[in-house]
């Protein structure tokens, strides 16, 4: 009887975790309000190909993929987590990071093609292929070419 109970608990745990990692398409209007505002402000001319909710065990994130291949990922509260496109809007790049990159690396028409932020700071990729890592105080931590 104990073996059966342990087996049932294990099965429930496995299926619960599997179900917790659930992706589903949603309407843009179902995104958090902050995410909708962000899209209207910075990507108003971009056509959305797909919006989806990525549900994990404890929270959700949202991905918006554009017809031109660009993508924005949002946290559950609607704050942007990652922006990937041909030319990331400069207004979302912290000024110290943008100033550093334009002064030192973004000459001859290079653009920011990806920015990602998390609790440790920012990861930025420019169109030349170089990647930069900054801490939360916008200090350069690493360069990868």
What are these regions (language model features)?
Residues 21-145:
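Interaction-mediating elements
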């Amino acid at each position: 009887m104990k073996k059966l109970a342990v087996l049932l608990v294990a099965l429930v745990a496995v299926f619960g975790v599997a179900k917790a990692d659930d992706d589903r398409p949603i309407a843009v209007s179902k995104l958090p309000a902050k995410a909708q505002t962000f899209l209207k402000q910075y990507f108003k001319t971009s056509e959305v190909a797909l919006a989806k909710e990525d549900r994990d065990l404890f929270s959700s994130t949202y991905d918006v993929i554009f017809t031109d291949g660009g993508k924005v990922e949002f946290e559950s509260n609607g704050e942007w987590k990652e922006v990937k496109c041909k030319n990331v809007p400069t207004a979302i790049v912290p000024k110290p990071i943008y100033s550093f990159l334009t002064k030192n690396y973004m000459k001859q028409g290079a653009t920011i093609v990806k920015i990602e932020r998390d609790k440790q700071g920012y990861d930025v990729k420019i169109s030349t292929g170089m990647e930069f890592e900054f801490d939360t105080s916008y200090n350069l931590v690493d360069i990868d070419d």
